[in-house]
UniProtKB/Swiss-Prot annotation:
Database matches in Gene3D superfamilies: 3.40.1350.10
Pfam families xrefs: PDDEXK_5
Organism per entry: Escherichia phage T7
Listed name of the protein: Protein 5.3
Highest taxon listed in the record's lineage: Viruses
MF (Gene Ontology): nucleic acid binding
Length: 118
């Protein structure tokens, strides 16, 4: 298995753990290549979660953490694909709603886009 797949699997497990600690029930889709990586439920409300791992990129002002959300040969996400984007930044998980990321093909996270820490 390649390093990227291992990192992605570890990120999904970290996000599932953090949601569980926050009182959610976590479900896994049967198909591994679905648009949602997890489904979470709390108080009867279900949400589809897409998990991404932030990578370090060089910018004019120093290092930044970035996630790719499509484009450059990859299909872009559309309405209904997921409700929550969970971004793993080192050991932290930042949560963004679909409305916050809709239409983006990449975004820097942390300093610019803080999200909600899970």
């Amino acid at each position: 298995m390649n390093e990227r797949h291992l990192t992605g699997a570890a990120s999904e497990m970290l996000v599932a753990y953090k949601f569980t600690k926050a009182g959610y029930t976590v479900y896994y889709p049967m198909l591994t290549q679905s648009k949602e990586d997890l489904v979470v439920c709390k108080d009867g409300k279900f949400s589809k979660v897409q998990v991404k791992t932030a990578t370090t990129v060089q910018t004019n002002t120093g290092d930044a953490k970035q996630v790719r959300l499509g484009g450059c040969g990859r299909s872009e996400y559309k309405d209904g694909d997921f409700d929550i984007l969970a971004v793993v930044v080192d050991e932290d998980v930042l949560i963004f709603t679909w409305d916050e990321v809709k239409g983006k093909t990449s975004m820097c996270v942390g300093k610019r886009n803080k999200g909600i820490k899970l």
